[in-house]
Amino acid sequence: SDDDFALVDALMRANEEMRVIAVGDDDQNIYEFRGSNSHYMEELGRMQGSRFIEMTENYRSSEHVVDAVNDFAPNISYRLKTAPIISMKKEKGMVSIIKHPPFFQDKESGEKKAVYMFLPIVNDILQNNRQGKTCILTQTNEEAVITVALLHENGLNAKLIQSMDGLRFWNIAEVRYFVKCIDRMQKTTRAPIITEDIWEEAKSKTLQKYSTSNSLPYLKRCIMMFELMNKAKYYTDLRDFLFESSVEDFCDVSDADIVVSTIHKAKGREFDNVIMLVVEPEHYTDDIMRRLYVGMSRTKLSLTIHTNGKIFDDIRADKRISDPIHYPMPDEIELQLSHKDVNLGAFKEHKKTILSLRSGDTLAYHDYHLSLPSTGTDIGLLSMNMQKKMLQWQMKGYLVTRATVRFVVAWRPKEAA
């Protein structure tokens, strides 16, 4: 970002002997929305005495996958790299492209209707016994949630890498309670280090209070990671660790046969097999091209791309299949709401009731309201933006049949002191 580069530049000016090593893959820069830009690396490379070194050896992906990635890379118009990547693996691997029609003509109305690729991807999983861990990569959160729900419907062991839309891990009820337990006991000692007795008691109380919560595994994994990294448990270190962490950091997918994720959430991860769902955009941009490049390069052995576009027509592939079937949307879909999809102010009068809820608890739904099934009391309301989205789904023929609590979180309005 501008600030990061300005800091590095200032440090270099103040320390003439300082050596700066900037490492990165410009083709995988998919965080421009955060201010990240490869131009900063290019600017460093232009400075006097600098050297630009391309590291071309790839130890993750099989030969045919790397060939496909190399063929795709020139679609990115602004690139620093020029040399092709070389696979250092013995496996040849497999690249498959399944082409779907962009739309179909309704025989009765004559309207052009979209072709959806959720069903063929699930059929692909069911029909092809891939060895190792498989990941389905989508471009949007909505695509990911619909896909994982369809996998579950077909009895497949799938997990979603959660997307929290900016929700802080620190604000989750289970985390707040754990810290509160430590705070209460630490007041008596006022020591900078959390004693083993206090630590274990706080863990025990939290695990007992939230034993039925679907969110508890995130905190348990967080605690385990903190224990592994810190022999001495400093209170300030714990608070910093919790405050700087995100829910995604503690999403354990090790026991899942199939992982579903957006490309952004899969950055930095790798899988034996990758299946990509790529809907043709109105316009291709470098940002989209880099995102697809990242998705393709997540796999170690096989890459399968389901697409209704032409962008993969010229890359090397072991198998090309044309699937002309007009797949509809699934009969049942799942929407995953974040804190931005509810009217937070509507919860203010029901704090005690909401704190008694646990992740996974069932809620009733009517007219954009969320209520307790036992009493019918309304305790929540969808945001105006989410109400519009729900109306669009209703116009497509979908009706809400059930709702569950995803997370219970702490929240304070901006105007609060």
Segments the model singles out, each with a brief description of its role:
Residues 63, 133-291, 296-304, 309, ...:
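Core RecA-like ATPase module of SF1/SF2 helicases and allied nucleic-acid translocases
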Residues 313, 317-417:
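Conserved active-site motif detector
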Residues 2-110:
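Conserved RecA-like helicase ATPase core segment
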Residues 105-130:
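Conserved interdomain hinge at the start of the Helicase C-terminal
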Residues 4, 37, 114, 118, ...:
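Amphipathic coiled-coil/heptad-repeat helices and related helical stalk/stem segments
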Residues 16, 26, 162-167, 281, ...:
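Short, acidic/turn-prone active-site loops that include or flank metal/cofactor-
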Residues 52-54, 77, 81-85, 124, ...:
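Flexible, surface-exposed loop/gating regions in the mature catalytic domains
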